[in-house]
């Protein structure tokens, strides 16, 4: 058994397709698409494979989805603090030729061990069809207990099972300290109109903070320049389309300037790219929110494209996300963001900073 890499993605997809093709009851198994399996190969997520020579005989995936919608804890009405202490045993797949050798249980144990090495004491959730007696028996033998029965994955009946090391542990909602700074930035959710329009929505939130009463799609429709390749000074694709990519700080700054100039507004937009996160806090102290680039649900960004402009190479990252930094708590080391996907959320400063740095410390301020 070994941890799989991106080089193993094709064999993972081939084995999954083989399982799907040979299932006598298709309701028992729901395939994972290629982009998701690719994400599962990126740390902190992991896929472990059992090999017979070069042949993939079985694999299991463990993922840390934080507070993303796919976290099964939402189905159990868990709060955000508990979600961040929860991993998902997403899939265990065993080639029919290798069944009967205990591979499902071995992979389950490996995934549990890995999850708790990264996040000691974490809860691990998984789903199994009520009619898949073999899988139910195996996961329950590894300490999983049924939490709920419901419909998932587009109409498939499932149990949610949990391996919960401390059922009595409480996860109180975060309460900021008396030293916390919090600005009243009204949140706007980008969906369903702008599935990839987080940047224009973040800009809209800040402009509305200054008294401009913009509708959700106005910036995206009237002021955002678009291009099929350029994500640095233009929006690559269409923010109304799920396949759109995004626009980086230089382009978003120019978008803001176009709007402010047309309105004869007193504010000016400035690109602060390169500024350490801690050096943005003085703006918050002055009641000035800052647009920053991080990732969706604090997921690991994955370099997927590049674009050269003015001799400089820029990299675009899958999971890139643009939000409004509108508060911080120096005692609890949290930052408050107005997130077009999650709403107003306190994020852990350390992880937020790691991703902010990885994306090039992109930030835009209007003042």
Tell me the role of every PLM-derived stretch.
Residues 120, 130-149:
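Conserved active-site alpha-helix within GNAT-family acetyltransferase domains
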Residues 94, 100-113, 137, 141:
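Conserved acetyl-CoA-binding loop-helix of GNAT-fold acetyltransferases
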Residues 298-300, 304-319, 323-367:
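Noncatalytic regulatory segments and standalone regulatory/sensor domains
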Residues 170-258, 262, 296, 303-307, ...:
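Active-site-adjacent structural segments surrounding the nucleophilic cysteine of cysteine proteases
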Residues 115-128:
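Conserved GNAT acetyl-CoA-binding A-motif
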Residues 59-91:
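Conserved acyl-donor/pantetheine-binding loop and adjacent beta-alpha core of acyl/acetyltransferases
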Residues 25-53, 61:
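Active-site rim helix/loop that mediates acceptor-substrate recognition in acyltransferases
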Residues 1-14, 25:
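A short beta-loop-alpha structural element at the N-terminal edge
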């Amino acid at each position: 058994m070994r941890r799989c890499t991106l080089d193993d993605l094709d064999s993972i997809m081939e084995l999954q397709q083989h399982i799907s093709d040979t299932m006598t009851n298709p309701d028992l198994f729901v395939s994972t698409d290629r982009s998701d399996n690719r994400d599962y190969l990126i740390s902190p997520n992991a896929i472990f494979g059992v090999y017979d020579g070069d042949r993939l005989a079985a694999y299991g995936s463990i993922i840390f989805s934080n507070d993303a919608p796919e976290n099964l804890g939402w189905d159990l009405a868990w709060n955000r603090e508990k979600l961040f202490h929860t991993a998902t045993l997403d899939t265990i797949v065993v080639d029919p030729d290798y069944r009967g050798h205990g591979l499902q249980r071995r992979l389950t144990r490996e995934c549990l061990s890995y999850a708790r090495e990264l996040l000691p004491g974490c809860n691990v959730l998984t789903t199994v069809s009520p009619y898949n007696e073999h899988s139910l028996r195996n996961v329950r033998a590894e300490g999983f207990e049924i939490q709920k029965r419901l419909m998932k994955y587009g109409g498939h009946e499932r149990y949610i099972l949990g391996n919960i090391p401390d059922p009595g542990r409480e996860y109180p909602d975060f309460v900021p300290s008396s030293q916390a700074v919090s600005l009243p930035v009204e949140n706007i959710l980008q969906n369903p109109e702008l599935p990839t329009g987080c940047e224009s929505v973040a800009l809209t939130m800040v402009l509305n903070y200054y008294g401009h009463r913009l509708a959700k799609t106005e910036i995206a429709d009237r002021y955002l320049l678009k291009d099929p390749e350029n994500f640095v000074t233009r929006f690559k694709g269409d923010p109304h389309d799920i396949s759109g990519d995004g626009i980086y700080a230089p382009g978003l700054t120019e978008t803001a300037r176009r709007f402010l100039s047309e309105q004869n507004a007193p504010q000016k937009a400035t690109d602060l790219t390169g500024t350490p996160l801690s050096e943005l806090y003085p703006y918050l102290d002055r009641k000035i929110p800052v647009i920053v680039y991080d990732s969706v649900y604090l997921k690991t960004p994955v370099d997927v494209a590049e674009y050269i402009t003015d001799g400089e190479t820029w990299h675009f990252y899958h999971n890139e996300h643009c939000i409004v930094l509108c508060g911080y708590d120096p005692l609890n080391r949290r930052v408050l963001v107005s997130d077009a996907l999650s709403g107003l959320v306190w994020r852990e400063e350390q992880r937020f900073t790691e991703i902010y740095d990885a994306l090039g410390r992109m930030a835009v301020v209007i003042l």
